[in-house]
Design a protein with these regions (language model features):
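GHKL-family ATPase ATP-binding module
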Residues: 1-232
Length: 232
């Protein structure tokens, strides 16, 4: 590698130009603007404050482009999802917390809405893990466990009653983003995270931070429980 040479003061960063090779890009060599826009917007949400500009000049008569920067990061991601899907949120603010241990870090945003569906999007080093993995499993386990503990502690659940995972996830939109130094994906397509140490790490952070939030926001906690109990 020759490294990067000096640049003029008005220049910055690295430019990469390429022409898609049909032997490598087997499905298509024509890029879909909407697919690229969705991916770029996703990255802008995952990296709060990062500005990403997409410009499509292939058709001079009809150029397309968009500049994206979200200071609220994945909190705005949740708001964007609810707005575009026409969903009514159960609380004004998105539940948001972070945590780290050693070289591992997790960032979570979640909010309940008036639908009956769950939407959990998980990412590892900005890669969308479509099939989930250890980070998502840790979140799901902690969510169910924490809500049951809170419910029994504050009398929202009877001693013999219990909320199931599908009950507490009904109407939930959540974004889970973990940053690791060594991602272990279970396939070449990187759709599932396999790092075993991430499950207890995420589970511990969610259990602590979510319990603190519920205790500090009893009205939101009550709304979540009303919805979860109705789902039984």
């Amino acid at each position: 590698s020759r490294g990067l040479g000096d640049v003029y003061k008005r220049q910055h960063g690295t430019s990469v130009m390429f022409k898609p090779d049909a032997e490598i890009f087997e499905e298509t060599t024509v890029f879909d603007y909407e697919v690229l826009l969705k991916r770029m917007r996703e990255q802008a949400f995952l990296n709060a404050g990062l500005t990403i500009e997409l410009s499509d000049q292939r058709d001079p008569a009809n150029p397309q482009g968009e500049k994206m920067c979200y200071e609220g990061g994945i909190r705005q991601f949740i708001e964007h999802i609810h707005k575009t899907r026409g969903l009514e949120s159960l609380s004004e603010q998105v539940i948001y917390f972070t945590g780290s241990k050693g070289d591992n870090a997790v960032e979570i945003a979640m909010q309940y809405n008036d639908s009956y569906n769950e939407l959990i999007l998980s990412f590892a080093n900005n890669v969308h893990t479509i099939d989930g993995g250890m980070h998502e499993l840790g979140f799901r386990n902690a969510l169910t466990k924490t809500l049951n503990e809170y419910g029994k502690r504050f009398g929202l659940l009877k001693d013999d009653s219990k909320l199931m995972g599908e009950d507490v996830r009904e109407g939930l939109t959540a974004i889970i983003s973990v940053k690791l130094t060594d991602c272990q994906f279970e396939s070449q397509t990187k759709v599932k995270l396999g790092n075993p140490e991430i499950k207890p790490f995420v589970e511990s952070i969610v259990s602590e931070k979510l319990m603190n939030y519920l205790e500090e926001n009893p009205a939101v906690a009550r709304a979540i429980f009303d919805k979860s109990l109705a789902a039984q």
